[in-house]
């Protein structure tokens, strides 16, 4: 898969969405913004399910300019799309190392689990141990581990992420990692800094994609300023977690 194309559906009132098509490519980061209830999660679900126009929104999703046949849709979706939700937990009761070895074997990937763990620990402030139980990991540790797993073990070219800024991890490193592995990354966010990380963002309202905005030069300059503030906030968070004074 090299491109994913969204074809318009309809909003909550039944009106057609105001775009012809939206083409997204591997290696691209695209953010999705809008008020609560604007349709962000529904858009993500349409992409995850490779919607054929029979769903609530009427949207259609093309892969490399073609529809995925109904009988293949479930299998293709499972292999092509990885979804990092806000609340994640493991049902497998085993250690981190055993999980990584098992997943690598299932995917027939020759990779050292220590390399995956090193990547995970680069984006979470609380280190993960190889012999630690999956079920004892915090929410941030879990998402960091899954981001590293998706980047290095999982072959899924499409990654859907819900509000990464709430995960307690370094979002810049996490998203840059996924892009560097040629993933198409779509991030639902309410945060201006996260939204401006992408060259393009989709604006949701009333259940529809109301606008596709390309980041302007002024917004790029604003992003640089917000990145400085983000780095400062990260440093203060580190001091706070260590029990040190902030001023």
Question: PLM features: residue spans?
Answer:
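Conserved beta-strand-loop-alpha-helix hinge in the C-terminal portion
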Residues: 208-239
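Conserved catalytic segment of ABC-fold P-loop ATPases
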Residues: 196-204
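A short, flexible loop at the N-terminus of ABC-type nucleotide-binding domains that lies
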Residues: 1-26, 55, 71
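Walker A (P-loop) phosphate-binding loop of P-loop NTPases
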Residues: 34-40
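GG-anchored amphipathic helix commonly corresponding to the ABC/SMC/Rad50 NBD signature/C-loop
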Residues: 139-159
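ABC ATPase nucleotide-binding domain signature region
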Residues: 28, 42-106
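H-loop/switch region of ABC-family ATPase nucleotide-binding domains
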Residues: 187-190
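Conserved ABC nucleotide-binding domain
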Residues: 119-136
């Amino acid at each position: 898969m090299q491109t994913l194309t969204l074809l318009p559906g309809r909003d909550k009132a039944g009106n057609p969405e105001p775009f012809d098509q939206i083409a997204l490519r591997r290696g691209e980061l695209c953010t999705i913004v809008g008020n609560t209830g604007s349709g962000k999660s529904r858009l993500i679900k349409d992409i995850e399910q490779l919607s054929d126009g029979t769903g609530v929104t009427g949207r259609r999703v093309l892969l490399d300019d073609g529809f995925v046949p109904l009988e293949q849709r479930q299998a293709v979706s499972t292999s092509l799309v990885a979804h990092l939700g806000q609340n994640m937990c493991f049902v497998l009761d085993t250690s981190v190392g055993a999980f990584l070895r098992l997943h690598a074997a299932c995917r027939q990937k020759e990779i050292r689990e220590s390399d995956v763990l090193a990547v995970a620990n680069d984006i979470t402030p609380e280190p993960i141990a190889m012999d630690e139980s999956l079920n004892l990991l915090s929410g941030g540790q879990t998402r960091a581990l899954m981001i590293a797993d998706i980047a290095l073990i999982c072959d899924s070219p499409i990654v859907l992420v819900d509000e990464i800024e709430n995960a307690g991890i370094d979002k810049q490193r996490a998203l840059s990692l996924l892009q560097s592995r040629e993933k198409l990354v779509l991030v639902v966010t309410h945060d201006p800094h996260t939204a401006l990380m992408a060259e393009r963002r989709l604006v949701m309202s009333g259940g529809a994609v109301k606008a596709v905005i390309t980041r302007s030069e002024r917004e790029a300059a604003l992003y640089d300023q917000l990145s400085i503030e983000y780095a400062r906030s990260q440093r203060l968070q580190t001091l706070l977690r260590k029990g040190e004074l902030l001023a």
